[in-house]
Amino acid sequence: MSGHSKWATTKHKKAVVDAKRAKSFARLIKNIEVAARTGGGDVSGNPTLFDAIQKAKKTSVPADNIDRAVKRGSGAEAGGADWQTIMYEGYGPNGVALLVECLTDNKNRAAMEVRTAMTRNGGSLADPGSVAYMFSRKGVVVIGKEGTDLTEDDVLGAVLDAGAEEVSDQGDTFEVISEATDLAAVRDALKAAGIEYDSAEASFVPSVEVPLDAEGATKVFRLIDALDDCDDVQNVFANYDVSDDVMAALEDA
């Protein structure tokens, strides 16, 4: 959900892209540290760490940075932070529900950053539980199509018996949805079938979506961008639905 550099002015676009790249690297490194701390530094016995490292590699995070993150997380090297996961709930423009996942070593700073981003961009924080019920914790695997002749049936055939609930064609990728507890089985089934995937992680999938026109989408994307720019924010999950026609109009604007 990060990106949307189209909202930046041309003058500042490169600086924005560079900053977002650095932010993306920092997020991925945090994920590796936490995975190593939780399940140990051996990827053969820690599928969460394996997936975090694979995602970092695909995003071109330097190997040295990855190795150091594993060592910090597993305790083999000093310097790891005491990361805590905090989830904030809120509403954006047009009543779009938001879950904001933070990974932070300072709860007060994270709360202030999220609250400021919300209030300055037409959003508001909500009481715990008032938004979360609109989302389900799911396993989400993204499979790139580039350089392959994979079909939706190929992917479905590989994962059907592993607990996959849905396989959808997203244009440049296929997306496999499962229960979060079946994520490892789906990932292993894809490996067994020789199908490479771009990412495999637990996510929050909305049960009901709010359709947005161009004006509403512009406001919601700006809020998501502002949240995304907060140092402690790892992920933003939202229940909006923007049609292909609206997205095309925004990209041409």
From Swiss-Prot:
- Which Gene Ontology terms cover its molecular function? DNA binding
KW Transcription regulation (keyword) present: yes
One BP annotation, GO: regulation of DNA-templated transcription
Q: Which compartments is it annotated to reside in? A: Cytoplasm
The record ties this protein, via Pfam families, to: TACO1_YebC_N, Transcrip_reg
Keyword Aminoacyl-tRNA synthetase attached: no
Q: Which domain of life is it from?
A: Bacteria
Predominant subcellular localization, coarse grouping: cytoplasm
Keywords (alphabetical) are:
Cytoplasm, DNA-binding, Transcription, Transcription regulation
Q: Name one GO cellular component term.
A: cytosol
Which HAMAP family does its entry note?
Transcrip_reg_TACO1 (MF_00693)
Q: What family does the Swiss-Prot or TrEMBL record give for this protein?
A: Belongs to the TACO1 family.
What PANTHER family would the database entry show? TRANSCRIPTIONAL REGULATORY PROTEIN YEBC-RELATED, TRANSLATIONAL ACTIVATOR OF CYTOCHROME C OXIDASE 1
The protein depicted here goes by the name Probable transcriptional regulatory protein Krad_3057
